[in-house]
């Protein structure tokens, strides 16, 4: 999982889901797990 300042480009990938957990924003992608990221 990468830590990114901005998740804007990752949100647009096919199969992406934006999830908020414990105050952090995550992008999860089951189709293509290399796009997994956390903001901050």
UniProtKB/Swiss-Prot annotation:
GO CC terms in record: ribonucleoprotein complex; ribosome
InterPro entries documented for this protein: Ribosomal_bL36 (IPR000473), Ribosomal_bL36_sp (IPR035977), Ribosomal_L36_bact (IPR047621)
Chain segments annotated as coiled-coil in the UniProt record: none
UniProt keyword list: Ribonucleoprotein, Ribosomal protein
Pfam families: Ribosomal_L36
Annotated GO biological process: translation
GO molecular function annotation: structural constituent of ribosome
Family the entry assigns: Belongs to the bacterial ribosomal protein bL36 family.
Cited NCBIfam families: PRK00831.1
Entries under PANTHER family matching the protein: 50S RIBOSOMAL PROTEIN L36 2, LARGE RIBOSOMAL SUBUNIT PROTEIN BL36B
HAMAP family noted in UniProt: Ribosomal_bL36
Protein name: Large ribosomal subunit protein bL36A
Species the sequence originates in: Kineococcus radiotolerans (strain ATCC BAA-149 / DSM 14245 / SRS30216)
Underlying gene: rpmJ1
């Amino acid at each position: 999982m990468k830590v990114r300042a901005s998740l804007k480009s990752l949100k647009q990938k096919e199969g992406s889901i934006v999830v908020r957990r414990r105050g952090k924003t995550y992008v999860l992608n089951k189709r293509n797990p290399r796009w997994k990221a956390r903001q901050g």
